[in-house]
Amino acid sequence: MDPRSEVLLRQAELFQGPLLIAGAPADDLLGQLPQAQAWTWHAGDQAMLDSRFAGRSHYAVEPPDLPFDSAVLFLPKSRELAAYLLNALASRLAGRELYLVGEKRGGIEGAAKQLQAFGKPRKLDSARHCQLWQVTIDQAPQAKPLESLAERFELALEDGPLQVVSLPGVFSHGRLDRGTALLLKHLDGLPDGHMLDFGCGAGVLGATLKRRYPQSRVTMLDVDAFAVAASRLTLAANGLEGDVISGDGIDAAPTELSLILSNPPFHTGVHTNYQASENLLKKSAVHLRKGGEMRLVANSFLRYQPLIEGALGNCQVRDEADGFRIYQATHG
């Protein structure tokens, strides 16, 4: 079980009425707290929770429209996302209890200061390198619309400016990361057809593809509900259309693709996790049509080339700069 869940269960007597667990991990916490419902924005966690606790987990960027007497937030990595989530929960809990649980190395002590906006926070427990905090909502805030927290910026690209809309918690929130910047220079000569932006984030790559290859169908896939929402906003901001879907890894992607384009993720919360990226490489042949291409950017220290060669039989390094490599391979 997640150590944060274990700390929460040490205080299980506090949770007598309907409880909302925001950012719930995919463990047995709902089994131990039968009065609880989960709110998650991670498609993989949602699938696992729903398979075990059908109807008790809700995947969205806003709290589910359910009655609850108290709520627990599992602290996310992003401080901006934590602020949005705390505000969204506190707006529904006037005079009631809001709890915050997280790892010490994830910044729980600093994040607990954000509770001061709603009342007087106090630390209830500390164990397993985690802490549990509580605040009674004396001053319930107005819920902030998610779009009001969006960061909007413009990229000067070869074929004109691209408007980008980023949301809290999305990778490289509010700015263009170096890996994607390098990959944007290598979008020439791509095979038309059905293109996939894997791990789409704020939708920079997918929107650029759709504008540069308007006759192609573009699908954008991400595990994170906030990234899915941001990508849809980015498409709309540029007058573009595309399919933006949520799913946990390449297994959720269509088949018969002409292209897989990606700056693949390798973080889950504060932890490093290469599984989604390695599965993408190993299973790429299942999702590409014959003659289809995979083009991606990755940190130079990651040994992705042997995995790509093992899956597709070939791989070339198109470019290397700023600690990143561009890989290209074709499904023969």
Curated annotation (Swiss-Prot):
Q: Give the reactions, separated by semicolons, that this protein catalyses.
A: guanosine(1207) in 16S rRNA + S-adenosyl-L-methionine = N(2)-methylguanosine(1207) in 16S rRNA + S-adenosyl-L-homocysteine + H(+)
Q: GO cellular component annotations, sorted alphabetically?
A: cytoplasm
Could you say which EC number(s) this protein's record lists? 2.1.1.172
Q: Which InterPro entries match?
A: DNA_methylase_N6_adenine_CS (IPR002052), Mtase_sm_N (IPR013675), rRNA_ssu_MeTfrase_C (IPR023543), RsmC/RlmG (IPR046977), SAM-dependent_MTases_sf (IPR029063), Small_mtfrase_dom (IPR007848)
Primary subcellular site in the record, as a coarse category: cytoplasm
Quick check: keyword Transferase in the entry?
Answer: yes
Q: Which domain of life is it from?
A: Bacteria
Location comes to: Cytoplasm
Q: Answer yes or no on keyword Methyltransferase.
A: yes
- The top EC class is transferase
Which terms does the record give in the GO molecular function aspect?
16S rRNA (guanine(1207)-N(2))-methyltransferase activity; nucleic acid binding
Alphabetically list the UniProt keywords: Cytoplasm, Methyltransferase, rRNA processing, S-adenosyl-L-methionine, Transferase
Q: How is the subunit organization of this protein annotated in UniProt?
A: Monomer.
Name the family: Belongs to the methyltransferase superfamily. RsmC family.
State its role: Specifically methylates the guanine in position 1207 of 16S rRNA in the 30S particle.
Protein name stated in the entry: Ribosomal RNA small subunit methyltransferase C
What is the native source organism of this protein?
Pseudomonas putida (strain GB-1)
As recorded in Swiss-Prot or TrEMBL, the protein's gene is named rsmC
